[in-house]
A protein has these predicted regions:
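Fe(II)/2-oxoglutarate oxygenase catalytic core
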Residues: 1-155, 159-178
Length: 180
């Protein structure tokens, strides 16, 4: 059975990941929030930077946009039925996320669970660094673990069929980009 979870390695190049990581390391981070816009560390414990891809003055947005558009088109070629549900367009708001050792998104969730995200068809996430001790994403319904590898992009359906959670690393920092 197909799981519709696609992996695109090297969707961001090493230099692009390093540029974005440097941006994260010099930015002001805020505690991560969950779908009710509240900090609930027992569900999601992270440091975030919310950004808007429409701000073309930010080079991080330009890097992300160029790669995301390319791979959304790849995904649509592999799964043309996705546009028959609802023409798929990206939401320009996304998060740069930093999970320090011991932090993570602990609770199983899907990506169209709130009123704000109820029309979401697909979900995406880039890994900015390789994490060898945890840091993975676990899709429960498929018993599938996706490794956090620098430059890797995941695209998957946003629905209840794709409940997932982070696997916490207790020794390494995980850096990622994900829609919100």
């Amino acid at each position: 059975m197909k799981n519709f979870i696609e992996t695109y390695d090297n969707a961001l190049q090493k230099e692009e990941c390093e540029y974005i990581i440097n941006f994260i390391n010099t930015a002001i981070l805020i505690p991560g929030v969950v779908s009710n816009q509240k900090v609930e560390v027992e569900i999601k414990d992270s440091w975030d930077i919310p950004l808007d891809m429409n701000d073309k003055s930010n080079e991080v947005n330009n890097i992300l946009f160029n790669s995301l558009v390319k791979y959304i088109e790849e995904y649509k070629k592999e799964h043309p039925q996705v546009d028959s549900i609802n023409p798929w367009r990206y939401d320009p708001i996304y998060n740069l996320q930093k999970y320090n050792p011991g932090q993570g998104y602990h609770k199983l969730h899907c990506e169209n669970i709130s009123l704000h995200t109820s029309n979401r068809v697909m979900a995406w996430m880039f890994y900015l660094n390789t994490v060898t001790d945890g840091g993975n994403t676990y899709f429960e319904n498929y018993d599938l673990t996706m490794n956090a590898i620098e430059g890797r992009l995941l695209i998957w359906p946003a629905y209840w069929t794709h409940f997932h959670k982070g696997i916490v690393s207790h020794t390494e920092t995980k850096l990622s980009l994900i829609h919100i």
